[in-house]
């Protein structure tokens, strides 16, 4: 809930609404950086996440589902040991079948100097403290293109870099070409067919 689809879609919807508001001001200048803070943008994201979490917990309780917060470790194919988040007594769960559904996490290459100040992954960017004047996004898959659209709608200069010569190489070419056209109209600079060799903070 706290990373991935829900927070990014919440942020995207907020930005899209604000972009629509800007279009409806009939020529009156509306600047994201002057009229809305990063904290205000993130506030709505956090509200949506909390609402979704509360809704899930209510549904779990209604359907007799027990939620255990802790660190699991398999002792055997039928025994799962859990260390509770509050570090209280460890206990075990036995079952005939276990389903492991931990979700995915961003790829973090060892050569990238992630610091959560200037260099972020697709999860930590959701906790950004201020809106930058420009941003470079590495990767033109679904997540990279989504964030390129979000930041460009805020009026932020975006460079989108990818090794492939097309965005979303796994979708129909007509769809990808239309997306590239739309992103260029939003002043996203597409640097396709290029490799990033190093990242340095200056």
Predicted regions mapped to residue ranges:
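Rossmann-like NAD(P)H-binding beta-loop-alpha module
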Residues: 129-163, 168-171
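Alpha-helical segments flanking ligand/cofactor-binding loops in enzyme cores
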Residues: 149, 180-181
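Glycine-rich flavin
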Residues: 1-131, 164-168, 174-175, 182-186, ...
